[in-house]
Amino acid sequence: LPPISDTVASGTHAGLDFGTTNSTLGIAARGGSPRLLPVEGDALTIPSALFFSLEDGHTYFGRKAVLEYVEGAEGRFMRALKSILGTSLMNETTLVGRERKSFQDLIGRFLRHMRERLESAGVQADKVVLGRPVHFIDDDPAADATAEAQLAAAARAEGFAHVEFQYEPVAAALYRESMLDAEELALIVDIGGGTSDFSVVRLSPERARAHDRSSDILASTGVHVGGTDFDRLLSIRHVMPHFGLGSLYADGKRSLPVWYFNDMATWHRINLLYTPKVLRDMRDLERAAAEPERLDRFRHLVEHRSGHRLAGAVEAGKIRLTDAPETEIVLDEPGLDFSLTVSRVAFEDATRDLVGKIQASLAEALATAGVSAEAVDSVVLTGGGAEVPAVRMAATASLPHARVIRSDAFGSVGLGLALDAARRFG
């Protein structure tokens, strides 16, 4: 691991933003300014991804993990593990090479990699403040508590002896507050890869010195909608029909099963399709389908383990649509030449329900706090999903007097967690 360029002060503590899509490490000493620690080369963010190579036996992380997989190395690629916390999958094991591993162990392996980065930089690595969404699981307090306990257990098992949690939007508020010179009422909008969280927080330079800030958090709400859901619906609505979704059996009366296509459009479900049984199913469905050429494309994805490459092309298309009115989603490899033009209008139509859920949760935060939209002084946008134009408009249109603060899309939570760690442990 490369050393950082300057010396880390003694008494420096860490915050870890373990995200569905990307993760960061923030560090700060009590009374000092927080900063992000480079976690992959010079990069301040790392994709929350692992690749277990069957070729050399190594475990790769982040961009290197994605690259190994995309280049066709033999092994197992894992991403979006955070979205499994609190679900039934956490009680299952999955085959990695010749071993079966629990998903908690896989999450722990990524957390260990982050802890090793702290140690290599000379940061005290036995204590950490971990970020968490307002809701890991919507409308299920027991499952939500289980998810937090699972994440804490995974961290402790990898050497973080003292684990504390802070809500991710609150962490983003702490960072915003460090830049203020007057009191304000802020709405923190954090659209992450897997969750969207909203907090109404009273911020001021004076209150920043208080140890207990609970009275300043007027409301926190959240919904299990994030950037990967936008990818999934874009894929289901516009891409998967070209791979068989919505097709009929040859009798013209019955639709083909949909679960294969839903899984292929969902990052953390794609690996479950790479089995001999699913491949046999695809061959059977090809023979029985009215449009076998579509199923032939799907079979190619399974046979050549190309599902994540297609999902990556969909995600890249979504990102381009933040600036462009239309884009092409392309997957061109031996045996499959797929290209599809998608407009921003079509993307927004496919994801309208997701935007509606975000708007409803935002309105709930204001109602729970007992404040009007006119009373909000600033809205802080963070998380990669906040870059989507329809989301940005939905989050700001109803706040007529609020200054829109577009913070570091991927770094503000990690910086706030570092501030919180310095306050708690310093």
Regions found by a protein language model. Give the residues of each.
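N-terminal phosphate-binding loop and flanking beta/alpha elements of the actin-like ATPase fold
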Residues: 1-44, 65-188, 202-223, 338-363, ...
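Phosphate-binding glycine-rich/basic clefts of nucleotide- and phosphate-handling proteins
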Residues: 45, 202-333
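Short, well-ordered loop/turn and helix-capping segments at boundaries between secondary-structure elements
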Residues: 236-245, 397, 401, 419, ...
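Conserved Rossmann-like nucleotide-cofactor binding loop
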Residues: 21, 194-196
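Intrinsically disordered or highly flexible coil/loop and linker segments, enriched in small
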Residues: 90-91, 120, 124, 244-248, ...
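N-terminal phosphate/diphosphate-binding loop that engages ATP/GTP or pyrophosphate donors
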Residues: 50
